[in-house]
């Protein structure tokens, strides 16, 4: 019964978080892929093209990808933790669950990013072939290894100490997002077919960090606090 609860509760929590934070994700994607635009110009550009709906242009693939990704990672992480396999720990369990999930979610992320950029994925697919589905996966793999080894394991560690899901999830998201930001930047640009090298100034690779934090911190806080709330409710029945 517990395994079904892990999947269901994490899926519900992720859908809620994704719907709330999707506009910021669209904003971030456009900002990282338009290096000549300021945040204000980028925001105006999205709105002028499609109005408010432009920020929700990739709703279906975004919700599908994030829901499957988070619920699968959470379920697998819990599964490996409960099995208590030898020679494993929280970080290894997180990495394994993240890599297994990313093989399916990366193609959906590709579709999402093209939609967020107001571009036709099908036209790009005809030009580039089916390899387009996994373009940028090397960056996605690196991002997955880092994020999966940190988010759930770090959250569990912090929550054992603070015993406050809001504080634990907030600190986890800030630390993890800041560390993996350069890979997120490279992944977003690689998927869209843009140049990766932006000079030796590390600041270029942290473009969009504030937007990423604005998206991921509330997303992870909403997800983990909702899971915690639903888990407690489930135990009452």
UniProtKB/Swiss-Prot annotation:
Report the record's disulfide bonds: none
Which membrane topology describes this protein? Multi-pass membrane protein
Per the record, GO CC terms? host cell mitochondrial inner membrane; membrane
InterPro entries given in the database record = Mitochondrial_sb/sol_carrier (IPR018108), Mt_carrier_dom_sf (IPR023395)
Q: What is its main location?
A: host cell
Instruction: Give UniProt keywords alphabetically.
Output: Host membrane, Host mitochondrion, Host mitochondrion inner membrane, Membrane, Repeat, Transmembrane, Transmembrane helix, Transport
Keyword field contains Transmembrane helix? yes
Q: Where are the Solcar repeats?
A: 1-83, 85-161, 164-233
Zinc-finger listed as a keyword: no
Motif Substrate recognition: positions: 191-196
List where the protein spans the membrane: 11-27, 60-76, 91-108, 140-160, 166-183, 205-226
Task: Tell me where it resides.
Answer: Host mitochondrion inner membrane
Q: Which domain of life is it from?
A: Viruses
SUPFAM superfamilies annotated for this entry? Mitochondrial carrier
Q: Which family does it belong to?
A: Belongs to the mitochondrial carrier (TC 2.A.29) family.
Task: State its role.
Answer: Transports dATP and to a lesser extent dTTP, TTP, UTP and ADP, possibly across the mitochondrial inner membrane.
Name of the protein this chain belongs to: Mitochondrial carrier-like protein L276
- Protein species of origin: Acanthamoeba polyphaga mimivirus (APMV)
Higher taxonomy: Viruses, Varidnaviria, Bamfordvirae, Nucleocytoviricota, Megaviricetes
